[in-house]
Amino acid sequence: MSDLHFSGVVLPGGEGEFWVSDGAVHLSHPGTTGPWTELRGYAVPGYVDAHCHVGIVSDGEPDLVRGRALALEDVAVGVTVIREPGSDLDTSPLDGQPGLPRFVRMGRHIALVKRYTRGLGEQLEDPSGLVAAVRRRAVEGHPWIKLVGDWIDRSVGDLAPLWPDDVLAEAVAVAHDAGARVTAHVFGEDALPGLLAAGVDAIEHGSGLGPDTIEVMVEKGIGLVPTMIQIENFPSIAEPAREKFPTYYRHMMALHDRRKATFRAAWEAGVAMYAGTDAGGFNVHGALPREITALAAVMPPEDAIAAASWRARQWLGFAGIDDGAPADLVIYDEDPRVALAHGGLPAPSAVVVRGALA
């Protein structure tokens, strides 16, 4: 633990000061003698990477040693909470380790055989098995459950939904009855109506959103993690399929080309959006500043920061810079809102995770 005293601008408010002692934030002097490490500048509640896989790697096999190293790469840019939407590696032994972020896990993805990345997640033989798979996740105690909502169907040569609407509705109800929330990977348009009607709590990616589905998202308060820097990878994802599945290729390219317009429309309509990098596959760890910068192309800079900070923390049940709250902080020498408006976030001058300087 570190004894810290901060003075400066405290986002999302204004000028202020606080102390960190025994791992917690104190808005008045806690009465301890110190010595105090002085911090000045701009304080932001610790960042959340709302779509980050430390248990998935693009090469070799994941393990806890590597997972820990990857999490530290995220901490270095200010990430103090990782929402991990699917992992075959149980990363729970990393919980509570000094210097590491807090985790919100979902267990393994739920998909269908030949309808997701080979070897990743639980891949069912038949859609009718979804309800039982969701029940297993709920019994495991995960606060969220991740479904693969669409993927290429090679029999039609394009993105297509994995699950019948009635099965989805029953599966989501089972999760909710157990106190779990449900999110779904969706690239295209066709899977969205069934997922939204079933009452999922969030959509990952969401590049196929349009006026009707955006309206439903707003009405139902369904969150969106657009993973904008992952959508930037669509050309390289689709290229290997260009000749064999030309319809899929053109579809993915169209989703890519209109991505900013799609997410700007979602933001302007009032969809709650959160920052996530999809690190662990195509994207490297420590990329959250890039995702925040991408979000700032479709919403105001302060809202892009909020999507990775205080709004994301509230969404997942974590406190901000509040009296008595666990101290997770990012400190900047310059105003991150101004820097973001001029092209990108600066490097933090300090990161505090679990009450200690990282």
Cite the ranges covered by each PLM segment.
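Divalent-metal coordination cores built from histidine and acidic residues
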Residues: L64-A178, I222-I231
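Distinct, well-ordered alpha-helical segments
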Residues: P93-Q97, L192-G199, T293
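Hydrophobic faces of well-ordered beta-strands that scaffold small-molecule active sites
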Residues: G46-C52, I82-E84, F103-G107, I145-L147, ...
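N-terminal metal-binding scaffold of metallo-dependent hydrolase/deaminase domains
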Residues: M1-P35, Y42-V44, D335-A339, A356-L357
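His/Asp/Glu-enriched, well-ordered alpha-helical/loop segment
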Residues: D177, H256-D335
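Active-site core of metal-dependent hydrolases
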Residues: S155-A261, A269, Y274, A279-F282, ...
